[in-house]
Amino acid sequence: MKKIILVAGGTGGHFFPAVALGEELIKRGYEVHFITDLRCKQYIKQDMKVIFHILDLKRSGNIFLFLPRLSIAVLKAIKLLYNMKPSVTVGFGGYPVIAPMFAAIFLRVPIIIHEQNSYLGKVNKFFASFAKKIAISYEKIKNLPEFAKSKIVVTGGVVRENIRELKVIEMSSRGLTTGSKKSLIKALDSVVKPRNDKLFTIFIFGGSQGAKLFSELIPASIQFLMQKQPSLELNIIQQAALDDQVKIKDIYSKLNITYEFAEFFDNMALQYKEADLVISRAGASTIEELTYIGLPAIFIPLPSAADNHQYYNAQLLEDEKTGWCLEQNNISAGKLADKILELISNPKILEDASQNLLKRRKEGHKLLSNLIEEVI
């Protein structure tokens, strides 16, 4: 049985798509090993079928500290890969892939890199010259070296199986035009106030890195929104830290808004199925999932994201009329409230955005697996 190594870490945005790819490759008869770091250890579940290996590389702004750490990590990775003898190594970008990719190059194992964002990251750009193929999610990608263009294959991003099973969530099946929808939200770690099925549902989350900003901005925006339109019936599903939930709960209760809180949503499919609109960061895996199911979003890019890639992701979607980009440095509770009210008041805008999203949907798990099989 041929072995394939996947390398991803740092955030859930890198981790979960790689796991989804691994599960597709296992179905095709490959033995899949996954090298990740300590940050992503928390996401490993017993029912995941790939074989995990933890290889941590701590970041440091001091080159004299980082180089010895990198050297040790590369030696460990060489030993790991030498014993496995993989047919190919696939890297998803970010600093956790550096050591395993160097090891693969040293052992002459073919490498493929996958860029999930619309801006080629520094690590992927560095390894582009060594890669057999470069898989990308967006047809328009920034920061791509001229020499790398011949290696490009547009595969789209890889979406988790439980999200793919949702297929297309038609706008008419949400709260926009029908009141028959039943709540599927049963998160055990949530704070839930019962809702009826006629409410417009907004799902707010900040990804695996969370979003402290949202715990302050969103409640203030909802207050503005209800002042402008007191008759609105809303349901809010929101990722929030435990110590923020009491304060937010008090605000929403006074506004007679139903709500659900969780520190982290383990099964996003349940929340996606409920939502009429999403407010989130603009990480690649979030965008791919929303694209796959045709769920429109207001994106507030994380300003500290490497190479400002979240801004480029969100701006591209706004240009394609598939979402809306509001920059954190320029946003206010009033501006966000105005945008939400505009979308609630004009369902056709949401419907058009949903259809535009579906036009760019790809079966990334299959296309990337096909590419890997071509290289082996």
UniProtKB/Swiss-Prot annotation:
Membrane topology: Peripheral membrane protein
Protein's GO biological process: carbohydrate metabolic process; cell division; cell wall organization; lipid glycosylation; peptidoglycan biosynthetic process; regulation of cell shape
GO molecular function, a single term: undecaprenyldiphospho-muramoylpentapeptide beta-N-acetylglucosaminyltransferase activity
GO cellular component terms listed in the entry, alphabetical order: plasma membrane
Reaction equation(s) it catalyzes: di-trans,octa-cis-undecaprenyl diphospho-N-acetyl-alpha-D-muramoyl-L-alanyl-D-glutamyl-meso-2,6-diaminopimeloyl-D-alanyl-D-alanine + UDP-N-acetyl-alpha-D-glucosamine = di-trans,octa-cis-undecaprenyl diphospho-[N-acetyl-alpha-D-glucosaminyl-(1->4)]-N-acetyl-alpha-D-muramoyl-L-alanyl-D-glutamyl-meso-2,6-diaminopimeloyl-D-alanyl-D-alanine + UDP + H(+)
InterPro entries reported for this sequence: GlcNAc_MurG, Glyco_trans_28_C, GlycoTrans_28_N, RPE4
Function: Cell wall formation. Catalyzes the transfer of a GlcNAc subunit on undecaprenyl-pyrophosphoryl-MurNAc-pentapeptide (lipid intermediate I) to form undecaprenyl-pyrophosphoryl-MurNAc-(pentapeptide)GlcNAc (lipid intermediate II).
NCBIfam families: murG, RPE4
Listed name of the protein: UDP-N-acetylglucosamine--N-acetylmuramyl-(pentapeptide) pyrophosphoryl-undecaprenol N-acetylglucosamine transferase
Organism: Rickettsia africae (strain ESF-5)
